Amino acid sequence: MYDRRAILSGLVLALALPSAARAHHGWTWAEGETFELTGVIQSARLGNPHGILKVMAKGEEWTVEVGQPWRNERAGLKDSMLVKGVELTIQGNRAKDRKLKVMKAARVIIKGKVYSLYPERS
């Protein structure tokens, strides 16, 4: 006979895990207003689950989450464009915790060209 508590616990866990994954990969950790940052790439780690740029802006190092490889490619953004020394502007959403210098990019602007990673976000 199955233990009701074990079944209920399993069901609760199964329902909770997808929301935890969405929270990490979603936008809930970020502010709702658009934030803009201009700086120079110090380093880049591109790939899944998403790329990470370290950007120096006004004397502070920021961590910028860019898209997954398919999202960057769809926007026309190539890995060769996201290398150390490139100056860029990022528009997106910064962390709600203002002590953290972290943001998620919705748009990347290089040499005046806009690469929209999330065209559905204004």
Language-model-detected regions and their locations in the chain:
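N-terminal export leaders
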Residues: 6-8
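Short boundary/loop segments of OB/S1/cold-shock single-stranded nucleic-acid-binding domains
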Residues: 21-34
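Structural detector for short beta-strands of small beta-barrel domains
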Residues: 33-49
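Short aromatic-glycine-enriched beta-strand elements
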Residues: 48-56
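A short macromolecule-binding patch
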Residues: 60-68
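Short nucleic-acid-contacting surface segments enriched for D/E, G, S/T with interspersed K/R
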Residues: 74-89
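OB-fold/S1-family single-stranded nucleic acid-binding modules
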Residues: 95-119
